[in-house]
Amino acid sequence: MLADVDYAMAHDGTSILAVNAFKEMEMERVWDPSRIVIPFDHIAPANTETSATLQKEIREWVREQSIPNFYEIGEGICHQVLPENGFALPGKLLVGADSHSCTYGAFGAFATGVGATDMAEIFATGKLWFKVPESFRMTVEGSLDKHVYAKDLTLYLIGKTGIAGATYKAVEFYGQAISELSVAGRMTLCNMAIEMGAKTGIVPPDEKTFDFLKNRAVAPYEPVYSDPDASYLKEFVYDAGDIEPQVACPHQVDNVKPVGEVEGTHVDQVFIGTCTNGRLEDLEVAASVLKGKKVTVRTIIIPASRSTLLAAIKNGTMEILLKAGVTLATPGCGPCLGAHQGVLGEGEVCVSTANRNFKGRMGKDGFIYLASPATAAASALTGEITDPRKI
């Protein structure tokens, strides 16, 4: 079907490709400047002259097109910036030139990622062709135990489903454990839907959603829900009580194990941040583990946005983290994509709160273990992978 896109996003890593394709189409003006969002987050600030020049070209194009929703370096990661600024709305179609654009499904939007050429088509017409995906229903009954977080739940589901188990499916999340997740936790969950192959991940909007969007939504919205008698290609039911702290081991996101099975693994670096776990709630969890203590390995913390950083400063979270010996970097993607601000050396091991641990992701010969902020912080204290329940 040919669908009308409500909001389109491309960041500094993909917008230049989309802009070049747009120009090759000999288009002069975008379909609607107010519906395009351009954040600089992937290599921000620029790490080379080449990156700086490409960013300069994007800024010039943004000015030429009179695009008002441009977010400079330091404003934050695209998948945090869009929700904070009210673009992620229930019932809307959001498309981003980034695979983790499915994050916005946490607000009841249909959100997905596309390539730069498809984004150029959206820039030009505001439309894009989609194959309507079949749906999976995942229900998580009961409540998560103390010290078990949204990231643990997410990794557990990916481990059960596999990296291709939900390929091109719309995965809908239900159950008490899902309802009890904060908005930030739901963003973590939907952010990683792509890691099981999903086209999108969706949490039905509720009062938590609407409260978050008060005084924030950029437009009126109408929530959309599945019919009570909707049929699904597959349905899965899990018990939240079965979930303990999880770790995704190198070099696949679905290589998931309970933390106890990898406890004691040597760690060279800990990274807490990214579009998966760089929100205020995540920093607060890390601070609760590190308060009054000192990290024993280099620990990099990168808030997901400037607003997140300011909030963490205001409520004392950042002071706790800095006193614990962490390194603070500019809000953005940081070393997640292996470009700057903490890439790994040969054979080094990192516990990261990111969403991918592929070989070469943070350095060609590094090893990445994905975990929650609590597990990451606990590991920063001991210098080895550690169960946060023991701290």
Swiss-Prot record:
Among PANTHER family, the record links this protein to: HOMOACONITASE, MITOCHONDRIAL (PTHR43822:SF2), HOMOACONITASE, MITOCHONDRIAL-RELATED (PTHR43822)
- Residue sites binding [4Fe-4S] cluster per the record: 275, 333, 336
Quote one Gene Ontology molecular function term: 4 iron, 4 sulfur cluster binding
**Family in the record:** Belongs to the aconitase/IPM isomerase family. LeuC type 2 subfamily.
GN (gene name):
hacA
Q: In which pathway does it act?
A: Organic acid metabolism; 2-oxosuberate biosynthesis
Q: What class of enzyme is it?
A: lyase
What NCBIfam families does the annotation carry?
hacA_fam, IPMI_arch, PRK00402.1
Q: Which HAMAP family match?
A: LeuC_type2
Give the quaternary structure.
Heterotetramer of 2 HacA and 2 HacB proteins.
Report TM segments.
none
Transferase listed as a keyword: no
Keywords, in A-Z order = 4Fe-4S, Iron, Iron-sulfur, Lyase, Metal-binding
Indicate what this protein is called per its UniProt record: Probable methanogen homoaconitase large subunit
Recorded catalytic activity of this chain's protein:
(2R)-homocitrate = (2R,3S)-homoisocitrate; (2R)-homocitrate = cis-homoaconitate + H2O; (2R,3S)-homoisocitrate = cis-homoaconitate + H2O; cis-(homo)2aconitate + H2O = (2R,3S)-iso(homo)2citrate
Q: What is its EC number?
A: 4.2.1.114
Query: What GO biological process terms does the UniProt entry carry, in alphabetical order?
Result: L-leucine biosynthetic process
Functionally, this protein is described as follows: Component of a hydro-lyase with broad substrate specificity for cis-unsaturated tricarboxylic acids. Catalyzes both the reversible dehydration of (R)-homocitrate ((R)-2-hydroxybutane-1,2,4-tricarboxylate) to produce cis-homoaconitate ((Z)-but-1-ene-1,2,4-tricarboxylate), and its hydration to homoisocitrate ((1R,2S)-1-hydroxybutane-1,2,4-tricarboxylate). Is also able to hydrate the analogous longer chain substrates cis-homo(2)-aconitate, cis-homo(3)-aconitate. These reactions are part of the biosynthesis pathway of coenzyme B.
InterPro entries referenced in this protein's UniProt entry, alphabetically: Acnase/IPM_dHydase_lsu_aba_1/3, Acoase/IPM_deHydtase_lsu_aba, Aconitase_4Fe-4S_BS, Aconitase_4Fe-4S_dom, HAcnase/IPMdehydase_lsu_prok, Homoacnase/IPMdehydase_lsu, IPM_dehydratase_rel_enz, IPMI_cat
Q: Does Phosphoprotein show up as a keyword for this record?
A: no
